[in-house]
A protein has these predicted regions:
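Membrane-interface, cytosolic juxtamembrane amphipathic helix immediately N-terminal to a transmembrane helix
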Residues: 10-22, 179-180, 186-217, 263, ...
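N-terminal juxtamembrane/topogenic regions of multi-pass membrane proteins
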Residues: 1-87, 106, 233-235, 280, ...
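Membrane-spanning helices that line or support transport/gating and their immediate boundary helices
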Residues: 75-79, 88, 99, 250-261
Length: 304
Protein backbone atom coordinates (compact mmCIF):
# COMPACT_ATOMS: atom_id res chain seq x y z
CA UNK A 1 0.00 0.00 0.00
CA UNK A 2 1.21 3.48 -0.85
CA UNK A 3 0.87 5.88 2.09
CA UNK A 4 1.80 9.17 0.47
CA UNK A 5 1.20 12.62 2.01
CA UNK A 6 -0.81 15.23 0.13
CA UNK A 7 1.16 16.74 -2.74
CA UNK A 8 0.85 19.64 -5.12
CA UNK A 9 -1.06 18.62 -8.23
CA UNK A 10 1.95 19.32 -10.45
CA UNK A 11 4.25 17.06 -8.43
CA UNK A 12 1.67 14.30 -8.42
CA UNK A 13 1.65 14.22 -12.22
CA UNK A 14 5.28 13.07 -12.18
CA UNK A 15 4.99 10.50 -9.37
CA UNK A 16 6.61 7.20 -10.38
CA UNK A 17 6.64 5.00 -7.27
CA UNK A 18 3.21 3.58 -6.57
CA UNK A 19 2.04 4.14 -10.12
CA UNK A 20 1.38 1.30 -12.55
CA UNK A 21 3.44 3.23 -15.10
CA UNK A 22 6.52 1.17 -14.24
CA UNK A 23 4.67 -1.97 -15.35
CA UNK A 24 3.20 -0.63 -18.58
CA UNK A 25 6.02 1.65 -19.74
CA UNK A 26 7.29 -0.98 -22.19
CA UNK A 27 3.81 -1.30 -23.72
CA UNK A 28 3.54 2.48 -24.08
CA UNK A 29 6.98 2.66 -25.68
CA UNK A 30 5.99 0.01 -28.21
CA UNK A 31 2.78 1.91 -28.90
CA UNK A 32 4.77 5.10 -29.47
CA UNK A 33 7.20 3.39 -31.88
CA UNK A 34 4.38 1.64 -33.70
CA UNK A 35 2.57 4.97 -34.12
CA UNK A 36 5.69 6.41 -35.76
CA UNK A 37 5.77 3.41 -38.10
CA UNK A 38 2.11 4.02 -38.97
CA UNK A 39 2.97 7.59 -40.00
CA UNK A 40 5.49 6.25 -42.51
CA UNK A 41 2.98 3.62 -43.67
CA UNK A 42 0.26 6.24 -44.29
CA UNK A 43 1.01 6.87 -48.01
CA UNK A 44 1.13 3.13 -48.66
CA UNK A 45 -2.23 2.12 -47.20
CA UNK A 46 -3.85 5.36 -48.46
CA UNK A 47 -2.75 4.31 -51.94
CA UNK A 48 -4.49 0.96 -51.39
CA UNK A 49 -7.72 2.78 -50.54
CA UNK A 50 -7.68 1.74 -46.88
CA UNK A 51 -9.15 4.40 -44.63
CA UNK A 52 -9.78 4.20 -40.90
CA UNK A 53 -12.13 6.61 -39.19
CA UNK A 54 -12.51 7.51 -35.53
CA UNK A 55 -16.21 6.61 -35.34
CA UNK A 56 -15.88 2.84 -34.66
CA UNK A 57 -13.00 3.46 -32.25
CA UNK A 58 -15.11 5.98 -30.34
CA UNK A 59 -17.90 3.43 -29.90
CA UNK A 60 -15.46 0.66 -28.96
CA UNK A 61 -13.61 2.98 -26.58
CA UNK A 62 -16.80 3.79 -24.69
CA UNK A 63 -17.67 0.09 -24.42
CA UNK A 64 -14.18 -0.78 -23.15
CA UNK A 65 -14.29 2.06 -20.62
CA UNK A 66 -17.62 0.81 -19.24
CA UNK A 67 -16.43 -2.78 -18.86
CA UNK A 68 -13.10 -1.68 -17.39
CA UNK A 69 -15.07 0.33 -14.86
CA UNK A 70 -17.10 -2.76 -13.93
CA UNK A 71 -13.96 -4.84 -13.55
CA UNK A 72 -12.18 -2.21 -11.47
CA UNK A 73 -15.23 -1.89 -9.24
CA UNK A 74 -15.24 -5.66 -8.73
CA UNK A 75 -11.53 -5.62 -7.90
CA UNK A 76 -11.90 -2.69 -5.52
CA UNK A 77 -14.82 -4.43 -3.79
CA UNK A 78 -12.51 -7.39 -3.12
CA UNK A 79 -9.87 -5.00 -1.78
CA UNK A 80 -12.32 -3.28 0.57
CA UNK A 81 -13.76 -6.58 1.80
CA UNK A 82 -10.25 -7.90 2.48
CA UNK A 83 -9.39 -4.80 4.51
CA UNK A 84 -12.61 -5.14 6.50
CA UNK A 85 -11.78 -8.76 7.28
CA UNK A 86 -8.36 -7.83 8.62
CA UNK A 87 -9.96 -5.05 10.64
CA UNK A 88 -12.32 -7.63 12.12
CA UNK A 89 -9.34 -9.83 12.95
CA UNK A 90 -7.71 -6.97 14.83
CA UNK A 91 -10.91 -6.30 16.79
CA UNK A 92 -11.48 -9.98 17.61
CA UNK A 93 -7.85 -10.49 18.66
CA UNK A 94 -7.87 -7.55 21.06
CA UNK A 95 -11.26 -8.50 22.50
CA UNK A 96 -10.31 -12.15 22.95
CA UNK A 97 -7.08 -11.40 24.80
CA UNK A 98 -8.77 -8.75 26.94
CA UNK A 99 -11.43 -11.22 28.05
CA UNK A 100 -8.88 -13.97 28.69
CA UNK A 101 -6.53 -11.69 30.62
CA UNK A 102 -9.25 -10.26 32.85
CA UNK A 103 -10.63 -13.75 33.53
CA UNK A 104 -7.56 -15.91 34.14
CA UNK A 105 -5.02 -15.02 36.85
CA UNK A 106 -2.14 -17.08 35.45
CA UNK A 107 0.00 -14.59 33.50
CA UNK A 108 2.33 -17.28 32.09
CA UNK A 109 -0.59 -19.20 30.65
CA UNK A 110 -2.13 -16.03 29.21
CA UNK A 111 1.22 -15.18 27.61
CA UNK A 112 1.14 -18.51 25.79
CA UNK A 113 -2.35 -17.78 24.51
CA UNK A 114 -1.32 -14.31 23.31
CA UNK A 115 1.50 -15.86 21.31
CA UNK A 116 -0.96 -18.26 19.72
CA UNK A 117 -3.02 -15.28 18.57
CA UNK A 118 0.05 -13.53 17.15
CA UNK A 119 1.08 -16.75 15.41
CA UNK A 120 -2.37 -16.99 13.82
CA UNK A 121 -2.15 -13.48 12.34
CA UNK A 122 1.31 -14.11 10.86
CA UNK A 123 0.29 -17.57 9.66
CA UNK A 124 -2.75 -16.19 7.85
CA UNK A 125 -0.63 -13.47 6.25
CA UNK A 126 2.01 -15.92 5.01
CA UNK A 127 -0.61 -18.41 3.82
CA UNK A 128 -2.36 -15.77 1.71
CA UNK A 129 0.98 -14.66 0.27
CA UNK A 130 2.24 -18.24 -0.21
CA UNK A 131 5.36 -17.58 1.88
CA UNK A 132 7.35 -20.08 3.99
CA UNK A 133 6.16 -20.08 7.59
CA UNK A 134 8.43 -22.28 9.72
CA UNK A 135 11.01 -19.65 10.65
CA UNK A 136 8.49 -16.99 11.70
CA UNK A 137 6.10 -19.32 13.55
CA UNK A 138 8.98 -20.86 15.51
CA UNK A 139 9.20 -17.61 17.48
CA UNK A 140 5.64 -17.98 18.78
CA UNK A 141 4.77 -21.68 18.95
CA UNK A 142 6.01 -24.59 21.02
CA UNK A 143 7.88 -27.27 19.10
CA UNK A 144 5.05 -29.81 19.24
CA UNK A 145 2.49 -27.19 18.20
CA UNK A 146 4.76 -25.98 15.39
CA UNK A 147 5.03 -29.50 14.00
CA UNK A 148 1.25 -29.91 14.05
CA UNK A 149 0.75 -26.57 12.32
CA UNK A 150 3.32 -27.14 9.57
CA UNK A 151 1.95 -30.63 8.87
CA UNK A 152 -1.57 -29.28 8.32
CA UNK A 153 -3.09 -28.38 4.95
CA UNK A 154 -4.56 -25.31 6.66
CA UNK A 155 -1.95 -24.06 9.16
CA UNK A 156 -4.03 -21.09 10.33
CA UNK A 157 -7.02 -23.33 11.04
CA UNK A 158 -4.75 -25.67 13.01
CA UNK A 159 -3.66 -22.76 15.21
CA UNK A 160 -7.32 -21.96 15.80
CA UNK A 161 -7.80 -25.56 16.92
CA UNK A 162 -4.87 -25.28 19.34
CA UNK A 163 -6.39 -22.08 20.75
CA UNK A 164 -9.69 -23.91 21.22
CA UNK A 165 -7.88 -26.77 22.96
CA UNK A 166 -6.20 -24.24 25.28
CA UNK A 167 -9.60 -22.82 26.25
CA UNK A 168 -10.94 -26.35 26.80
CA UNK A 169 -8.06 -27.13 29.19
CA UNK A 170 -8.81 -23.98 31.19
CA UNK A 171 -12.45 -25.02 31.36
CA UNK A 172 -11.62 -28.53 32.59
CA UNK A 173 -9.30 -27.05 35.22
CA UNK A 174 -12.13 -24.93 36.54
CA UNK A 175 -10.59 -21.64 35.40
CA UNK A 176 -13.46 -20.89 33.03
CA UNK A 177 -17.17 -21.23 33.60
CA UNK A 178 -19.42 -22.59 30.87
CA UNK A 179 -20.72 -19.10 30.11
CA UNK A 180 -17.22 -17.62 29.78
CA UNK A 181 -16.09 -20.57 27.67
CA UNK A 182 -18.99 -20.04 25.26
CA UNK A 183 -18.21 -16.30 25.06
CA UNK A 184 -14.52 -16.90 24.32
CA UNK A 185 -15.36 -19.64 21.84
CA UNK A 186 -17.59 -17.15 20.00
CA UNK A 187 -14.52 -14.93 19.62
CA UNK A 188 -12.70 -17.86 18.05
CA UNK A 189 -15.63 -18.32 15.70
CA UNK A 190 -15.29 -14.65 14.68
CA UNK A 191 -11.63 -15.26 13.87
CA UNK A 192 -12.57 -18.42 11.97
CA UNK A 193 -15.02 -16.35 9.89
CA UNK A 194 -12.18 -13.97 9.02
CA UNK A 195 -10.06 -16.94 7.90
CA UNK A 196 -12.86 -18.26 5.70
CA UNK A 197 -13.50 -14.81 4.22
CA UNK A 198 -9.84 -14.32 3.31
CA UNK A 199 -9.69 -17.80 1.76
CA UNK A 200 -12.82 -17.02 -0.26
CA UNK A 201 -11.17 -13.94 -1.77
CA UNK A 202 -7.76 -15.53 -2.27
CA UNK A 203 -9.00 -18.73 -3.92
CA UNK A 204 -11.86 -17.30 -6.00
CA UNK A 205 -10.43 -15.01 -8.69
CA UNK A 206 -12.49 -12.97 -11.11
CA UNK A 207 -13.56 -15.36 -13.93
CA UNK A 208 -10.62 -15.78 -16.31
CA UNK A 209 -12.71 -15.53 -19.49
CA UNK A 210 -14.02 -12.11 -18.41
CA UNK A 211 -10.50 -10.87 -17.70
CA UNK A 212 -9.16 -12.32 -20.96
CA UNK A 213 -11.83 -10.67 -23.12
CA UNK A 214 -11.09 -7.25 -21.64
CA UNK A 215 -7.33 -7.74 -21.86
CA UNK A 216 -7.43 -8.76 -25.51
CA UNK A 217 -9.85 -5.99 -26.46
CA UNK A 218 -7.80 -3.29 -24.73
CA UNK A 219 -4.56 -4.27 -26.43
CA UNK A 220 -6.13 -4.75 -29.86
CA UNK A 221 -7.78 -1.35 -29.49
CA UNK A 222 -4.44 0.28 -28.62
CA UNK A 223 -2.70 -1.46 -31.55
CA UNK A 224 -5.30 -0.33 -34.09
CA UNK A 225 -5.76 3.17 -32.65
CA UNK A 226 -2.83 4.85 -34.49
CA UNK A 227 -4.34 3.89 -37.87
CA UNK A 228 -7.47 5.91 -37.01
CA UNK A 229 -5.63 8.86 -35.49
CA UNK A 230 -3.02 9.32 -38.19
CA UNK A 231 -5.52 10.51 -40.80
CA UNK A 232 -6.29 13.64 -38.75
CA UNK A 233 -3.34 14.09 -36.38
CA UNK A 234 -0.45 12.92 -38.53
CA UNK A 235 2.77 13.79 -36.61
CA UNK A 236 0.89 14.17 -33.31
CA UNK A 237 -0.39 10.60 -33.60
CA UNK A 238 2.28 8.96 -31.34
CA UNK A 239 1.62 11.36 -28.46
CA UNK A 240 -2.18 11.14 -28.51
CA UNK A 241 -2.09 7.38 -29.06
CA UNK A 242 0.18 6.89 -26.03
CA UNK A 243 -2.04 9.11 -23.89
CA UNK A 244 -5.19 7.16 -24.77
CA UNK A 245 -3.39 3.82 -24.45
CA UNK A 246 -2.06 4.83 -21.03
CA UNK A 247 -5.60 5.34 -19.76
CA UNK A 248 -6.89 1.96 -20.89
CA UNK A 249 -3.81 -0.16 -20.20
CA UNK A 250 -3.24 1.34 -16.75
CA UNK A 251 -6.85 0.61 -15.74
CA UNK A 252 -6.43 -2.97 -16.97
CA UNK A 253 -3.18 -3.32 -15.01
CA UNK A 254 -4.65 -1.79 -11.86
CA UNK A 255 -7.60 -4.19 -12.00
CA UNK A 256 -5.15 -7.11 -11.99
CA UNK A 257 -3.45 -5.73 -8.87
CA UNK A 258 -6.71 -5.17 -7.00
CA UNK A 259 -7.95 -8.65 -7.87
CA UNK A 260 -5.50 -10.13 -5.34
CA UNK A 261 -5.39 -7.68 -2.41
CA UNK A 262 -3.15 -9.95 -0.31
CA UNK A 263 -0.03 -9.70 -2.49
CA UNK A 264 3.07 -7.55 -2.10
CA UNK A 265 2.57 -5.11 -4.96
CA UNK A 266 2.27 -1.35 -4.54
CA UNK A 267 -1.50 -1.28 -4.26
CA UNK A 268 -2.01 -4.39 -2.12
CA UNK A 269 -2.94 -4.48 1.56
CA UNK A 270 -0.09 -3.86 4.05
CA UNK A 271 -0.44 -7.22 5.81
CA UNK A 272 3.04 -6.97 7.36
CA UNK A 273 2.09 -3.69 9.01
CA UNK A 274 -1.31 -5.00 10.14
CA UNK A 275 0.24 -8.11 11.72
CA UNK A 276 2.88 -5.91 13.31
CA UNK A 277 0.14 -3.71 14.82
CA UNK A 278 -1.72 -6.77 16.15
CA UNK A 279 1.49 -8.13 17.68
CA UNK A 280 2.36 -4.83 19.35
CA UNK A 281 -1.15 -4.42 20.76
CA UNK A 282 -1.33 -7.94 22.19
CA UNK A 283 2.15 -7.81 23.71
CA UNK A 284 1.48 -4.44 25.32
CA UNK A 285 -1.85 -5.68 26.67
CA UNK A 286 0.08 -8.55 28.25
CA UNK A 287 2.75 -6.19 29.70
CA UNK A 288 5.56 -7.80 27.72
CA UNK A 289 9.01 -6.21 27.92
CA UNK A 290 10.15 -6.92 24.35
CA UNK A 291 7.94 -5.07 21.88
CA UNK A 292 8.82 -5.05 18.15
CA UNK A 293 9.30 -1.72 16.41
CA UNK A 294 6.37 -0.35 14.46
CA UNK A 295 6.62 -0.90 10.70
CA UNK A 296 6.70 2.41 8.82
CA UNK A 297 6.51 3.22 5.09
CA UNK A 298 9.82 3.06 3.22
CA UNK A 299 11.38 5.97 1.36
CA UNK A 300 9.00 5.36 -1.53
CA UNK A 301 6.01 5.62 0.86
CA UNK A 302 5.27 1.90 0.46
CA UNK A 303 3.86 -0.05 3.40
CA UNK A 304 3.95 -3.83 2.93
Amino acid sequence: MIVRPQQHWLRRIFVWHGSVLSKISSCLLLNFLFSIAVIFMLPWYTHLGIKFTLAPFSILGVAIAIFLGFRNNAGYARYVEARKLWGQLMIASRSLLREVKTTLPDSASVREFARLQIAFAHCLRMTLRKQPQAEVLAHYLKTKDLQRVLASNSPANRILLIMGEWLAVQRRNGQLSDILFISLNDRLNDISAVLAGCERIAYTPIPFAYTLILHRTVYLFCIMLPFALVMDLHYMTPFISVLISYTFISLDCLAEELEDPFGTENNDLPLDAICNAIEIDLLQMNDEAEIPAKILPDRHYQLT
